[in-house]
């Protein structure tokens, strides 16, 4: 691809991402499906803006590579060891059963046993990129279904290696001593990567970090990820597996969080490019010619994989509320199927139209998953939210709550318990289905759903409630809910959780008067107790705490308009800090002159 064509393609990709994703979000179909549809639109079977799909698809696989590196960073070896049973138990069972059933279905058509076997293995693989993206969107990462889903995906990545080695054997290509020698060299090189990564990479990053130049650290992070991917591809192994191992080797290092920050922007963009490329690769000509056969194949693929996954979830004693999510999020074909099927076609294991038919089936199955997860969300919402409620109230029973609490983590639980202890009618909205089912078993009135959806807020009674308390973990979700409430429920009093000063500034700018900085309040309380242990009277310590809170809030409001100015902001912060100290000292001196009858028993 020429430089001008490459630049044009880059601009086009960014344009469709900027346009397609917000539209998809507005339609409620999810970002992944938006990317896929955008890819179809600009690909060779759509408007034809992009022709060289294979080159772009290969490049866009780097999105999966970056994703696996970040996942590796979040898993230390000890945590990975605890997952060994689910990886090699449930993961192996999923691949084995799915291969047997799907391969058997292919064999009943015009596939030979060799092509049916490799076809079954390829169709058994799920899309790591899509599944992990959807798990994050649905809040499944820390749930039982999310942990087990990750274990299955990891085993699938490992299974690609022997599957690729199996293809020449199925093709009848005989190996010689040289083949075994090359395999031995690959194993030795792989072990060398493990040892080198364990003992050399951390000192290298320590040396780079000492320079204090952030750009060099980012370059080193990219070098590590891309170098690991290239090394594994040279060995004929999975690029994603190589970067996953590199991430695990650095999971316990002091540079873990800095590496995540450096890699995250590249991961997001390249994952979007990957999904766009998958959409572009969809052969609409084959689809039009064999539409009935392909639609049946997609239905069988999704149904068989979902049934296998649901069965394994039940055997594994997963909560009933999570089985559907687990089965749905992994029910599609995956990106490694493209690699396996292309390799099989090069060895003539797959013949004629078998390759394009399988590729179209896998691509369409990936497009069904976001829609399937939306259907599952609605099923779960009805099952766990509505109890003898008419159909026109689709999510939650509306009995005019006084307060709606969004989020039922530790922060939201404390608030909810305080409100219920004071006989307040509350409705709690939570999108982690495992938390919903667990808390409902204890008698809490918790409902499943994503509070960034306007319809859910309506059915929860936001138009009749007096207040809404937003305790989301993600600041972007908090701001989206704030905007929805201000636009559609202007009489609703908004109270919000702020993770820090940045989120507090954003809430102030939107007009939210009532918010709490989670670390600030607990730090102030501990600071008050520290003053008491240093000899200050409890009453004076409490007054000092109150003065500091009031003055800090004043400084927060004064600095709000200057949030974006670097040099001026630093100067103003220093000035405000000095002013805060002066005012604080004057007020505390006045306070000490006041008589106090409070002793330590009143603390």
From Swiss-Prot:
Any one GO molecular-function label of the UniProt entry: glutathione-regulated potassium exporter activity
Subcellular location as annotated: Cell inner membrane
Gene Ontology BP terms: proton transmembrane transport
Top-level lineage group: Bacteria
Pfam families the UniProt entry points to: Na_H_Exchanger, TrkA_N
GO CC aspect terms: plasma membrane
Key word Lipid biosynthesis present: no
Ranges annotated as spanning the membrane: 5-25, 29-49, 55-75, 87-107, 115-135, 152-172, 180-202, 207-227, 230-250, 268-288, 291-311, 326-346, 356-376
Domain RCK N-terminal: 400-521
Chief place where the protein resides: membrane
Keywords: Antiport, Cell inner membrane, Cell membrane, Ion transport, Membrane, Potassium, Potassium transport, Transmembrane, Transmembrane helix, Transport
InterPro entries registered for this protein in UniProt: Cation/H_exchanger_TM (IPR006153), K/H_exchanger (IPR004771), K_H_efflux_KefB (IPR020884), Na+/solute_symporter_sf (IPR038770), NAD(P)-bd_dom_sf (IPR036291), RCK_N (IPR003148)
NCBIfam families the UniProt entry points to: 2a37 (TIGR00932), PRK03659.1 (NF002973)
Function: Pore-forming subunit of a potassium efflux system that confers protection against electrophiles. Catalyzes K(+)/H(+) antiport.
Cited PANTHER family: K(+) EFFLUX ANTIPORTER 3, CHLOROPLASTIC (PTHR46157:SF4)
Family assignment from sequence similarity: Belongs to the monovalent cation:proton antiporter 2 (CPA2) transporter (TC 2.A.37) family. KefB subfamily.
Assembly with partners or alone: Interacts with the regulatory subunit KefG.
HAMAP family referenced in this protein's UniProt entry, alphabetically: K_H_efflux_KefB
Name of the protein described by the UniProt record: Glutathione-regulated potassium-efflux system protein KefB
This protein's encoding gene: kefB
């Amino acid at each position: 691809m020429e430089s001008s064509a490459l630049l044009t393609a880059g601009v086009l990709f960014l344009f469709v991402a900027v346009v397609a994703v917000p539209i998809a979000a507005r339609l409620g179909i999810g970002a992944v499906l938006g990317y896929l549809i955008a890819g179809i639109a600009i690909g060779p079977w759509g408007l034809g803006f992009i022709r060289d799909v294979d080159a772009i698809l290969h490049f866009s696989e780097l999105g999966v590579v970056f994703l696996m590196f970040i996942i590796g960073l979040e898993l230390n070896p000890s945590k990975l060891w605890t997952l060994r049973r689910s990886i090699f138990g449930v993961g192996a069972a999923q691949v084995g059963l799915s291969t047997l059933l799907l391969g058997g279905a292919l064999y009943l058509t015009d596939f030979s046993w060799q092509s049916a076997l490799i076809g079954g293995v390829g169709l058994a693989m799920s899309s790591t990129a899509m599944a992990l993206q959807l798990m994050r969107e649905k809040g499944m990462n820390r749930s039982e279904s999310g942990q087990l889903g990750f274990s299955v995906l990891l085993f699938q990545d490992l299974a690609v290696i022997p599957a690729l080695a199996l293809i020449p054997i199925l093709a009848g290509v005989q190996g010689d001593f040289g083949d075994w020698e090359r395999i031995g060299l690959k194993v030795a090189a792989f072990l060398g990567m493990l040892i080198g990564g364990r003992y050399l990479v951390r000192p290298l990053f320590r040396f780079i970090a000492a320079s204090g130049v952030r750009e060099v650290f980012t370059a080193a992070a990219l070098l590590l990820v891309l170098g690991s991917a290239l090394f594994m591809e040279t060995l004929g192994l999975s690029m994603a597996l190589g970067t996953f191992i590199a991430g695990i080797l650095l999971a316990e290092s002091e540079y873990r969080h800095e590496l995540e920050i450096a890699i995250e922007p590249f991961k997001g963009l390249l994952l979007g490019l990957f999904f766009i490329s998958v959409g572009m690769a969809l052969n609409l000509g084959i689809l039009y010619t064999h539409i009935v056969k392909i639609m049946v194949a997609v239905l069988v693929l999704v149904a068989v994989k979902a049934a296998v996954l649901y069965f394994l979830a039940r055997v594994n004693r997963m909560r009933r509320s999570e089985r559907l999510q687990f089965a749905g999020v992994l029910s599609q074909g995956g990106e490694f199927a493209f690699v396996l099927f292309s390799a099989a076609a090069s060895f003539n294991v797959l013949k004629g139209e078998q390759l394009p038919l399988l590729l179209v089936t896998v691509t369409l199955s990936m497009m069904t998953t976001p829609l399937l997860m939306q259907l599952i969300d609605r099923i779960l919402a009805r099952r766990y939210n509505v109890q003898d409620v008419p159909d026109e109230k689709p999510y939650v029973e509306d009995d005019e709550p006084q307060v709606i609490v969004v989020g039922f983590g530790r922060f939201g639980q404390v608030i909810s318990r305080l409100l219920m202890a004071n006989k307040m009618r509350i409705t709690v909205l939570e999108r982690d289905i495992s938390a919903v089912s667990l808390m409902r078993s204890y008698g809490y009135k918790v409902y499943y759903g994503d509070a960034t959806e306007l319809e859910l807020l309506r059915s929860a009674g936001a138009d009749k409630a007096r207040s809404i308390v937003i305790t989301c973990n993600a600041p972007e979700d908090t701001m989206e809910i704030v905007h929805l409430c201000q636009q559609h429920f202007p009489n609703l009093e908004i109270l919000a959780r702020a993770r820090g000063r940045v989120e507090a500034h954003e809430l102030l700018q939107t007009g939210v008067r009532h918010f709490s900085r989670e670390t600030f309040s607990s730090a102030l309380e501990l600071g008050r107790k520290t003053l008491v242990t240093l000899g200050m009277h409890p009453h004076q310590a409490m007054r000092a705490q109150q003065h500091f809170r009031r003055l800090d809030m004043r400084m927060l409001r004064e600095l709000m308009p200057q949030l974006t100015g670097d040099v001026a902001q630093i100067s103003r912060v220093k000035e405000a800090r000095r002013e805060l100290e002066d005012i604080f000292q004057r007020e505390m001196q006045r306070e000490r002159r006041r008589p106090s009858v409070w002793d330590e028993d009143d603390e």
